[in-house]
Amino acid sequence: MSTKTRLEPQPPDLQPPWRTAARVELQLEARAFAQDIVLPIADELDPKKGEMPRSLIDQMAAKGWFGITIPAQHGGMGLGVFEYCLVSEELARAWLSVRSILARGQGLGTQTINDDRRLGLLRRSAQGKWIGAIALSEPTAGSDLAAVQTRATREDGYWLLSGTKRWAGFALAADFIEVLARTREPKDGESSSAGLETFLVVKQPGIFPEGMTARN
């Protein structure tokens, strides 16, 4: 006889002044999605470290959840961090990896590019079509990011990245990777983080760009 896993316990109910009809509706929608859609997939894939299916990401995108905090005029829901946390908490109860994927939308990877391109990418982000990975840690640099050894050098009008990263979850399936690299050593009197910059590496899902290799 098969049994159906239940999510227990439930988070406490929202209380005034944070409780609104719209927030309760959003929370209950995410709770039902976590129970009925996410949990069965997690029960099957998580024990064997299986990859999240694209179909699940697409279902989340159809609900608009990758754009919870993106303004409505750019294709998002135009809500705030509170609403994002409500959805994130409910999804995490079923599968923590789903919460991680949710955070990779919300306009990630659009902050430092020109305005014209940013507007288009915000819309893609809200649609779940601009989902990123973040490459910070290295074999010798974990919590101390000032110890990062990856280098970025300017050559012929381009930036050349050279180094090794680790623990960059979702990197293969991502649409882009944000890579932390050092462009120069700190000068006397500067913070140890001086010279660290983030670079946006655009890629095709399932493929690493030329010159980049990976292993599990």
List the model feature ranges, each with a label.
Residues 1-103, 124:
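Amphipathic, small/basic residue-rich leader segments at the start of a protein or domain
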Residues 18, 100, 119-216:
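FAD-binding core of flavoproteins
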Residues 29, 33, 108, 151, ...:
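Residues within well-formed alpha-helices
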Residues 44-47, 113, 138:
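Short, flexible loop segments at the rims of nucleotide/cofactor-binding pockets, characterized by
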Residues 49, 95-96, 116-118, 179:
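Short, solvent-exposed helix-helix connector turns and helix-capping sites enriched
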Residues 80-83, 111-112, 146:
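Short secondary-structure transition/capping segments
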Residues 106-115:
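Helix-loop "lid/cap" segments that line or gate small-molecule binding pockets
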